[in-house]
C-alpha cells in the first residue's frame, strides 16, 4: 500500500485544477500543465486539496496512485513556483552563452555546440561557466539538463566537464610510476 498516495496535494491560491475525464489540467501563474490519470486511479477535489485513491484495492492500483500523486504535486508546484536547475562548466576554455532559445556551448571540441531549448524551458548565464535552466515542467527540465550534461559529462581524474551545481564528483588518483 502506497504511503505517498495517502497524503493530499495542497493547491495554493492562484492555481486551478480541472478534470475532464482522465485528463487533469493544472493552471497557474507560470503556465498550464496537464497529464493523464491512470485507469486504476481516482481523483477527488476538496476545498484547497486534492486526494488520490486507487479505484480498486490492489497493489498495482496503490502504486499507480502514489505515482499520480507525485506527478500531480510536481505539476502544482511547477505552475505556482517553478523549478530551476543549475549547471557548472569546469575546464579550461569551457563556456556557455544564451542567444534567444539556443544555448551555445564551447566544451573543448573542435566545434561549438548549439543546443535548442524546447518550448517551456528558459536559460540564462550569469557567468560564462554557469547555466541556470528554469521551467514549470520538472520532467522536461531534468531531461534538458541531462542532455546538456551528456555533451561532456564530468571525468573522474580532473573533474572537467558539465556538472550539476549540487553534484559531487568522485575523484580518482592518477597512476603512479
Curated annotation (Swiss-Prot):
One of its GO terms (cellular component) is cytosolic large ribosomal subunit. Keywords: Ribonucleoprotein, Ribosomal protein, RNA-binding, rRNA-binding. NCBIfam families: L6_bact (TIGR03654). Belongs to the universal ribosomal protein uL6 family. GO terms for molecular function: rRNA binding; structural constituent of ribosome. PROSITE patterns: RIBOSOMAL_L6_1. Pfam families: Ribosomal_L6. This protein binds to the 23S rRNA, and is important in its secondary structure. It is located near the subunit interface in the base of the L7/L12 stalk, and near the tRNA binding site of the peptidyltransferase center. One of its GO terms (biological process) is cytoplasmic translation. This is Large ribosomal subunit protein uL6. SUPFAM superfamilies: Ribosomal protein L6. Gene3D superfamilies: Ribosomal protein L6, alpha-beta domain (3.90.930.12). Part of the 50S ribosomal subunit.
Amino acid at each position: 500500500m502506497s504511503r505517498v498516495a495517502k497524503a493530499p496535494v495542497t493547491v495554493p491560491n492562484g492555481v486551478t485544477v480541472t478534470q475532464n475525464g482522465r485528463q487533469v489540467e493544472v493552471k497557474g501563474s507560470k503556465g498550464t500543465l496537464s497529464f493523464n490519470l491512470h485507469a486504476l486511479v481516482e481523483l477527488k477535489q476538496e476545498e484547497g486539496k486534492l486526494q488520490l485513491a486507487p479505484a480498486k484495492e490492489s497493489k498495482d492500483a496503490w502504486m499507480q496512485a502514489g505515482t499520480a500523486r507525485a506527478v500531480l504535486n510536481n505539476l502544482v508546484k511547477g505552475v505556482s513556483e517553478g523549478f530551476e536547475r543549475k549547471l557548472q562548466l569546469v575546464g579550461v576554455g569551457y563556456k556557455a552563452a544564451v542567444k534567444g532559445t539556443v544555448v551555445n556551448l564551447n566544451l573543448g571540441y573542435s566545434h561549438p555546440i548549439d543546443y535548442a531549448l524546447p518550448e517551456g524551458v528558459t536559460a540564462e548565464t550569469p557567468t560564462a561557466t554557469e547555466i541556470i535552466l528554469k521551467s514549470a515542467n520538472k520532467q522536461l527540465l531534468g531531461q534538458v539538463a541531462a542532455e546538456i550534461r551528456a555533451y561532456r559529462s564530468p571525468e573522474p581524474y580532473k573533474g572537467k566537464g558539465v556538472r550539476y551545481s549540487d553534484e559531487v564528483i568522485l575523484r580518482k588518483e592518477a597512476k603512479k610510476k
